[in-house]
């Protein structure tokens, strides 16, 4: 077990703050305090690992933990959150109190999962012997524990769902970036959504940092931590406490590699990273979204122009879990109906924050992500795919009935050299990978290349070969990739399946 700083403090108030112990008499809590040890676990450190013997129960006083199960391929699968006020390791401890080998003595059993601190956390530990002694003297403690275990069993698989992030770290990559004004604009946009938020630039008051952050979370819907990347205590603390990290950089700047040190803790896999590129004014500057995504190990890239406006509102909706993602299915000519869906959403004043799809649905989604208005989308789709036949360059059918040059030229004419990371909003297209039998999600690279892959109807258009893999129409394996959109963002998903 990796711990930091064992402490001997009055644990009765801490135990009384745990919800499932709130009805337990104070004398029982005082007895529990005599059997307990109070210590801290820094973010990313293990409380215990899978396979280690269990002889204690832990109570989370502040912070949070994540349970992870080791998979055969070496990955760690996230099993669920353990929040402040909940016990950890109770199942293994109770099971270990049974005589398994028949020698008349209770046996320890190994933990079946690893538990890591997701934030700087404080924990109370009570040994099995101490808990048994305590339960015999104060049965109400055991009754409370049984009620909690039964409640967890009723929850079943619901526990493995990730909780919505509440603490966001906005990390400037340069001291010349002033986040204050933009953070205030973001706070105003969140307020319009009915979301209470707090901007924090340092730990305030005399509380311990873990208790300070717990209080912030209880009092606010969203907490925004502002820091500048570098070797300073506040930056390191905000990185440990954040649920999601936003790397804020100038759009015309070049990243260094890597931005963050490599971490071996599976807890780091839950600290999802986004890149936020700042533009001055409405003009889009040449930027390097792919470089920033690689340098930060980021999942998404966003652009922010004017301090207040559509981009700020989109970020606020994304943070609040109120973003809107549209996903369009393939369907050949029927996919033109997606244009009507886009028009209807806009007429109703429903914003579109994410766009994606498969086959021709991805082409329409790409038009939306380019930032074109309704008339522009209709004009370009009509010109590129209706007024002339893009499949008219017939070929000896070796890999396709047509050569595909016309389609390539249409895509180049309308989408040019636009990179997916340069688009107005996060975008994806789905293609089918014939090499490994799975579908591929395109979220980086040339937009027209991703669209060419997702519309490569087998037997009609030649496939796209990318990095030695053969890609064809996304509709073959995932014609309506609503599941991909669900993974991309936490807000609403509007799907159109034709």
Describe the predicted segments one by one.
Residues 210-222, 230-356, 366-498:
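Patatin-like phospholipase
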Residues 357, 361:
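Gly/Ala-rich beta-loop-alpha elbow adjacent to hydrolase catalytic centers
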Residues 122-148, 282-306:
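Helix-enriched interaction subdomains in cytosolic or periplasmic regions
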